[in-house]
């Protein structure tokens, strides 16, 4: 049975345009895959505990699983490992990731657990699976109207590659601060693009 992990990184939670589009996509996927199971992690509604000295110290000890925060890390990694596909809905904050998504990354990107490191660099330990990222922004950072840099896309791509995830797609919702008409236009454009290339085509029903 197919398993989809949805990460909502917006502090606006269910009210974010990215998350609303993500839930539309989930509904569409369920029509194609009736047995699809959804695991939704809302990082805004249910924030993760901050990392501190105890966690940093545990990373360097021979028995790291004694640290309570490692239970959080293992739980998040387990959600990722059990998923057949990953859908991330995230805003762009100050040219890059929101703090909530960065914290999720810090929990799941763990040496000797989700990646190894050797003379040739870091190697992901997770099995590859399709990943789709919905990026929402008030301004424009892609295309002819771009007026700001995008550090989110290359950084998140590198993080996912380090985990072992290479089947990546990004969809951008831009110009969301320019009123209701602009919001409708960017959502319609995204829906149109996604209709031409259905999400997670490689998934098969169990």
From Swiss-Prot:
It is an enzyme of class 1 (oxidoreductase). Keywords: Flavoprotein, FMN, NAD, Oxidoreductase. It catalyses: 2 a quinone + NADH + H(+) = 2 a 1,4-benzosemiquinone + NAD(+); N,N-dimethyl-1,4-phenylenediamine + anthranilate + 2 NAD(+) = 2-(4-dimethylaminophenyl)diazenylbenzoate + 2 NADH + 2 H(+). FMN binds at residues 10, 136-139. Its cofactor is FMN. Binds 1 FMN per subunit. It comes from the Bacteria. Its EC number is 1.6.5.-, 1.7.1.17. One of its GO terms (molecular function) is oxidoreductase activity, acting on NAD(P)H as acceptor. SUPFAM superfamilies: Flavoproteins (SSF52218). HAMAP family: Azoreductase_type1 (MF_01216). PANTHER family: FMN-DEPENDENT NADH-AZOREDUCTASE 1 (PTHR43741), FMN-DEPENDENT NADH:QUINONE OXIDOREDUCTASE (PTHR43741:SF4). Belongs to the azoreductase type 1 family. Quinone reductase that provides resistance to thiol-specific stress caused by electrophilic quinones. Homodimer. This is FMN-dependent NADH:quinone oxidoreductase 4.
């Amino acid at each position: 049975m197919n398993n989809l992990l949805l990460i909502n990184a917006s502090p606006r939670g269910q009210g974010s345009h990215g998350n609303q589009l993500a839930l539309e996509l989930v509904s569409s996927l369920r029509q194609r895959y009736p047995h699809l199971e959804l695991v939704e992690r809302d990082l805004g509604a249910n924030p993760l505990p901050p990392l501190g000295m105890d966690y940093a110290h545990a990373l360097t000890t021979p028995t790291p699983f004694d640290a309570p925060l490692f239970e959080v890390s293992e739980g998040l990694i387990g959600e990722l490992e059990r998923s057949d596909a990953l859908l991330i809905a995230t805003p762009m904050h100050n040219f890059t990731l929101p703090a909530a998504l960065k914290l999720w990354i810090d929990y799941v990107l763990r040496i000797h657990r989700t990646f190894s490191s050797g003379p040739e660099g870091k190697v992901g330990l997770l099995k590859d699976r399709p990943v789709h990222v919905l990026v929402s922004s008030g301004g424009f950072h892609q295309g002819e109207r771009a007026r700001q840099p995008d550090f989110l896309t290359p950084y998140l791509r590198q993080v996912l590659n380090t985990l072992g995830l290479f089947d990546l797609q990004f969809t951008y919702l831009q110009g969301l601060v320019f009123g209701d008409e602009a919001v409708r236009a960017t959502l319609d454009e995204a829906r149109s693009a996604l209709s031409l290339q259905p999400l997670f085509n490689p998934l098969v029903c169990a």
